[in-house]
């Protein structure tokens, strides 16, 4: 008499399937954990080297952050739909004009990186409305935001002459307050006394 065929079904396959799924889940979690640790380790913070990037200006030219090495750079990440960004834009322009019109002007720059998806169509009316004269760059795919690991807009990074992040500011500021204008002037003068490629700020 032929013995009955063994029952095929989930009872025999389930343990193996469960083990395989568990192993895959553990591997994925370990991989994500390593990625998260790696991202935290390179998060740009004050004292760290500012990550280089390139982006397109309104006129179509490509600009790299490293092209401005030797200047103090205010990197402002913003969007036209952001109300706090709109509130601080006039004071950024006033700060720009005050310092650029003085003896330290050639050593100072503001880069405003827009994360607007529509880029030029959204930014041009904003630029005209507030009479912005500093360079505006487009980051519609969010690459610069990811590099700098921003959590919202506006976020601003002050980068010294040596290319290191001096300060990180989350949220809007009244950028042309007298004490801030003097602080920026001090950072520019301080950097001028150091050779290019010198140490990071303390």
Model-derived segments and spans:
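N-terminal targeting signals for export/organelle localization
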Residues: 1-52, 178, 199-202
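Thiol-/selenol-based redox modules, centered on thioredoxin-like
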Residues: 31, 155-202
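Short loop/turn microsegments at loop-to-beta-strand junctions
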Residues: 50-51, 73, 153-155
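Short, ordered coil/turn segments that flank beta-strands lining enzyme active or ligand-binding pockets
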Residues: 58-59, 161
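Short active-site neighborhood of thiol/selenol oxidoreductases, capturing the structured segment around
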Residues: 63-86
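Conserved helix-turn-beta segment immediately C-terminal to the redox Cys motif
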Residues: 71-72, 87-113, 128-129
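Short, internal strand/loop/helix patches
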Residues: 111, 116, 124-162
């Amino acid at each position: 008499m032929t013995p009955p065929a063994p029952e095929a079904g989930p009872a025999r396959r389930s343990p193996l399937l469960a083990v395989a799924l568990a192993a895959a889940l553990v591997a994925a979690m370990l991989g994500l954990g390593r990625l998260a640790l790696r991202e935290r380790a390179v998060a740009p913070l004050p004292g760290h080297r500012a990550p280089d990037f390139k982006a397109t200006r309104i006129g179509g030219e490509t600009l790299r952050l490293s092209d401005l090495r030797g200047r103090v750079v205010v990197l402002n990440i913003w969007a036209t739909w952001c109300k706090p960004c709109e509130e601080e834009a006039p004071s950024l322009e006033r700060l720009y004009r005050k310092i650029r019109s003085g003896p330290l002007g050639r050593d100072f720059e503001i880069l405003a990186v827009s994360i607007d998806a529509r880029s030029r169509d959204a930014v041009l009316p904003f630029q005209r409305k507030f009479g912005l004269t500093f360079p505006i760059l487009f980051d519609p795919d969010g690459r610069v935001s990811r590099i700098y690991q921003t959590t919202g807009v506006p976020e601003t990074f002050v980068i010294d002459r040596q290319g290191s992040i001096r300060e990180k500011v989350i949220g809007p500021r009244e950028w042309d307050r007298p004490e801030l204008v003097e602080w920026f002037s001090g950072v520019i003068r301080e950097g001028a006394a150091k050779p290019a490629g010198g140490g990071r700020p303390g």
